[in-house]
Amino acid sequence: MRGALYIGMLSALFHLIFFSGQLQAQELRANVEINAQAATNVDPQVFQELQQAIASFLNERKWSSDNFEDFEKIECSFFINILEAKSNDQYNASLTVIANRPIYNTSYTSTLINRFDKDLTFTYKQFDPLDFNENQFINNLTHTLAFYAYFILGMDYDSYAQNGGEVYFQKAQELVNNVPSTSGFSGWRSFDNNNQNRYWLVNNVLNSRYTSFREGNYTYHRLGLDRLVDSKDTAMLSLLSGMSSFSEVGLDAPNLPIMQLLSDTKKLEWLNLFSEEKSDIKSAALKSLTTIDPNNIEEYRSRFK
């Protein structure tokens, strides 16, 4: 049970264990928005209905075997930007996925995922159901949404227990493997978008060579952020330990999709978190950031003076 991962947290932050006869609540509280300004030749009602259908797909489907109360749901957002509407009800779009986790004993949250996916092509006719089959690729839109639902769960569970999200990353990888190489949909193949794709994203996470990434996720969030209020000095050491784990991956294999995801997700948090700390803390964080996020290292140096 995911509830076991929250031992010692406030009741508003840990997962209760239900009796089998009780109602099973879903895991996600997903906000869905569609920007269709570019689709001037399509009735806006089509996108309003699609937006509602996607929200229902994400929020009403059971993605795990664990039981969640309403206040335990993972807060996340799916932003779809329609780039082109074709005459055959086909759309080219981009997708931004953001997911947050609460920080124990505070009113703050930490962003776990901030992912921009440029490869979303799908077909949708008004009133069409959003079909989905975990074992078969039948709809690129729902397949992509499901991939990110499982990836969110994997990152969330990993942040509470070492490798706690394994089963969800495995499910995300199975979705990748179910897409035929001849599908014609970009984002699933190893060579799509200069390797910044779904294939490599989940492959990186599950690769034993990069276990330090997942170790860092747990140490940084559960042993670091969650303990800042109760034991700041110890928590800060754990935060730096988590950063060091991330740095090991960046040093071993620069430009990995998971490292790009990490930098995109955590940059603002790191700037705010470490900029007011003691010089030794800032120096240690900066050392790790040199390999975690080299493209923004000058900004970190400027803020950590």
Positions of the model-derived regions?
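A cross-kingdom marker for long, charged
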Residues: 33, 215-305
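Sec-exported extracytoplasmic/periplasmic mature domains
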Residues: 55-63, 154-158, 271, 275
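Second-shell loop/turn segments in exported
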Residues: 37-44, 131-139, 251-252
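Start-of-domain marker
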Residues: 26-92, 103-105
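Flexible, glycine-rich surface segments
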Residues: 161-256
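Acidic/His-rich structured neighborhood in mature extracellular/periplasmic domains
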Residues: 89-203
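Bacterial N-terminal signal peptides
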Residues: 8-22
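Positively charged n-region of N-terminal signal peptides that target proteins for export
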Residues: 1-5
